Curated annotation (Swiss-Prot):
Modified residue annotations for Phosphoserine: 133, 135, 140
Compartment(s) where it occurs, according to its Swiss-Prot or TrEMBL record: Cytoplasm; Nucleus
UniProt xrefs under InterPro entries: Rpn13/ADRM1, Rpn13/ADRM1_Pru, Rpn13/ADRM1_Pru_sf
Signal peptide interval: none
Lineage, opening ranks: Eukaryota, Fungi, Dikarya, Ascomycota, Saccharomycotina
Coiled-coil portions: none
Gene3D superfamilies registered for this protein in UniProt: Proteasomal ubiquitin receptor Rpn13/ADRM1
Chain's role: Component of the 19S cap proteasome complex which acts as a regulatory subunit of the 26S proteasome, involved in the ATP-dependent degradation of ubiquitinated proteins.
Post-translational modification N-acetylserine, affected residues: 2
Designated name of the protein: 26S proteasome regulatory subunit RPN13
Length: 156
């Protein structure tokens, strides 16, 4: 499958993250993430955009546009969230963005349990971010662990 035919789109909201309290607060707005190859496609870069799909009440929410560089960016499930499925987009600069998945879980899955569809999205994201050489395997596992240990408490 050539990269240029790959566009990943899924429903997700954005979270506010407070560095001091380490609280992650989902903003109650429907949104969408779209990831597609950047024009520097031969370098393996990807364009990432989150945008609200409805008008937020009482606040401005701008789209978030980022460039994903394989090997420099990770998509990490946040294990400490009990009331939702939260992922962090973590850059090697330690910049991070938090998103909550908005596809309804079918059946009786716990709120924080990834559905088959979520796992598919996760695997696609990992595929996008890993099409680089795996030379610094050690370091990246460390980083993953660090990101997962962020205390995320959902404010309902």
């Amino acid at each position: 499958m050539s990269m240029s035919s790959t566009v990943i789109k899924f429903r997700a909201g954005v979270c506010e993250y407070n560095e001091d309290s380490r609280l992650c607060t989902p903003i109650p707005v429907q949104g969408e993430i779209e990831i597609k190859p950047n024009e520097e496609e031969e370098l393996g870069f990807w364009d990432f955009e989150w945008r609200p799909t409805e008008k937020p009440v009482g606040r401005e929410l701008d789209p978030i546009s980022l460039i994903l560089i394989p090997g420099e960016t990770m998509w990490v499930p946040i294990k400490s969230s009990k009331s939702g499925r939260i992922f962090a987009l973590v850059f090697s600069s330690n910049e991070r963005y938090f998103f909550w998945l908005q596809e309804k879980n079918s059946g009786n899955l716990p709120l924080n349990e990834l559905s088959a569809k979520d796992k598919e999205i996760y695997n696609k994201m990992i595929g996008v971010l890993n099409n680089s050489s795996e030379s610094d395997e050690e370091e990246s596992n460390d980083e993953k662990q660090k990101a997962q240990d962020v205390d995320v408490s959902m404010q309902d």
